[in-house]
Structures are given as C-alpha cells and as structure tokens.
C-alpha cells in the first residue's frame, strides 16, 4: 500500500509539468512563426521594413527569455515558500513535576513551546490550528499543499499552467509572470492584426499569401492574452483588498453556507484570552490595511522598483533558527517575514465584541505570563 501511494505521488509530481511543457511548446512555436513567417518573410523581405522587423523580433525574444526566467524562479529557484515549524503554543505549563516512587526527588520535563501571540486563528475552544502532516501549528493564511507536501505561507492557489503552488515567496514573481506574458502576447497579436491588413492591401492584385502559421499564432496569442490579462487584473484586485485567491473563494462560500472564522485574542485590560467568532454577516477582509498602496506592498514588497524587476523574493529578512530544546520563543522570532498581521479594523472589531460580551469562551494561557512582545 505504501509503495503504491509513493508511486502515485511521483506520477502526480511529473503530471503537474505536462501543461507547462505544452505552454512552453506553444510559446516556442508562436515565437518561430511570428519571427520567421511574419517579421522576416513578410515585414522584412516583402514590405522592406527591416528596422521594424528587427525591433519586433528583439522585443518578442527578450520577453520570451524574461517569461521563461520568471517561470524557473517561480517553480524551482524560489518556490512558494515553506512555513517554519511552529511548536505548540504555551497554553499549558511546559514543565511538569513528577515525584518518583523510590525517592523524593522531583524531575522536571520540559517541552519546546512558543509564547502565544496576542491574536491567532483558533477553534471554538481557543486552541490554534494544527497540521497533522507537518506536525506543526498552521498559522494565519497558511495551508497545507498535498502537491508539495508541506505548509505554504499565504497560500494563494495552485496554478496548473505554471505547475506549482503560488504562495508568499513567489506571488510577486507570479504577478510579474502574468504581466510580462500578457505584454508579450499583446505585442504579438496586435502587430499581426496590423500587418495582416497591410500585407493583404499590398498584395491586392495577387493572392494574400498569408501563412497558416501566422493565423494559428494569432489565435493562440489572443486566447493566451485574454487568460493572462484577466489573471493579472484579478491578482491586482485581490492585492488591493489584501486577499488571496483562496481567501476570496472561501469567503464567498462562508457567506453562502454560513461558516465562520474564529480568533483567540488576549485582552491586556482583562488579563484574559477571549475566543471571538465572526459569522457570515460580519465577514470582511481581516488583513486589509485600508490603503491600496499598503495592501499591494504587503504582497509585492516595499521596494517599488522591484515590482518591475523579476528577481527573487519580495523581502530580504530571514527566519531565525530554532532555539534550544525546551526553550521558549516568540512567534515573531520563528516566522520572521512570514508573520501575518491583522488589520487595525479587525482588532477593533474583536475588542468591540469582547466589550459587548459576544465571545464563545475565555481561557488563561501560561505563556501570557512570559512577558510576550505584544
């Protein structure tokens, strides 16, 4: 059984590259048809517009290289990212004293634990979400990927055309991929449409002599541009609201089927944790910074120049290494750039619910006495 399961996983890992290979093949075919059949044979040789032909060929080939380079980063060099392992929160004491039967000596057993943050997503009892596959806490906006076998921070979606998951690390590259690919296809189909008319007018006394490869490239370019342009537009729209594609889908289902979202919040005034629930009528973008620029920077990085330069991750800081066994660490130290911050509006909404007595439960966490960096 285990062997057959491993074989299926390996087959799926290879299967996810079938569509990207098809896309790459169509890109190579379209580039050849565009550069040779249109630019060289028609624009250069027939219409005697050598400078235009060279310019179009250089632009298309350059964008081809950029698109392929971005794809390599998205899938291989950068990837979607991996959430660091997060030990259970320090809700119960990490040290337990046991008295042996033969002696009166106490023994202390310590466990790795994380000081709980001020607010985290939880179940109705106030306990954080656990990933049984990774044996780690699953933090906000993190989801487990069965394709890659680990938890992805800020999981957006699985893109079958690219062949991998889009997450925190490669989201900016994904947006740049859609932008550069749509620009490439736009140049191709617009210039083909322009020169089809010129070529037919130039050969009005003869047969139009349009190569079938040019027509097929035009069809593929228009269809591909519609796909990539709509993908780019939806990504920009979701970024402006500080939402991922998965969150938008889940939120719509919550509003339709009445599911809920629950947070465990530490009130400094009451020195107590409250479990607060948001039902479908109270749903909003919990991460929205109330500024389109701030929301986009949260996805694309603070350096605006890097928004157009397709290179690397949108941040430079790293996660700190794990502490010693039995030590207590904060979530900020573990997650580093993967830490997600709720909006001020969401925090205020939680505090308002607490003041009105609208909460599911209360609890005291041992880690709240450890002077956490709230």
Swiss-Prot record:
Signal peptide: none annotated. Its main location: membrane. One of its GO terms (biological process) is protein palmitoylation. The keyword Hydrolase does not apply. One of its GO terms (molecular function) is protein-cysteine S-palmitoyltransferase activity. It is a multi-pass membrane protein. Keywords: Acyltransferase, Lipoprotein, Membrane, Palmitate, Transferase, Transmembrane, Transmembrane helix. Autopalmitoylated. It is found in: Membrane. InterPro entries: Palmitoyltrfase_DHHC, PFA4/ZDH16/20/ERF2-like. It catalyses: L-cysteinyl-[protein] + hexadecanoyl-CoA = S-hexadecanoyl-L-cysteinyl-[protein] + CoA. Residues 1-13, 77-173, 239-374 are cytoplasmic. The chain crosses the membrane at residues 14-34, 56-76, 174-194, 218-238. Belongs to the DHHC palmitoyltransferase family. PFA5 subfamily. PANTHER family: PALMITOYLTRANSFERASE ZDHHC6, ZINC FINGER DHHC DOMAIN CONTAINING PROTEIN. This is Palmitoyltransferase PFA5. It comes from Saccharomyces cerevisiae (strain ATCC 204508 / S288c) (Baker's yeast).
